[in-house]
Amino acid sequence: MIEINTFLLNGQKYTTSETITLLDLINYFGYNKSLLVIEYNEFICKNTEWDKIRIQKNDKIEIVTIVGGG
């Protein structure tokens, strides 16, 4: 039986039938890794943890990109 995981990313609901990590998610959406801050279930994640954190059912993820300017 295939397990379906539903999670929130920046307030939007997503569903996956595969086990994915935060890094997989970042790569899928094409984010620039050097300009990100990620909140995972209300905790800020270090970029060294992105490949270790597996997205689970009902997780809440916020990805914020840093934009410079003047």
Regions found by a protein language model. Name each.
Residues 1-69:
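Ubiquitin-like/PB1-type beta-grasp interaction modules and other compact soluble beta-rich domains
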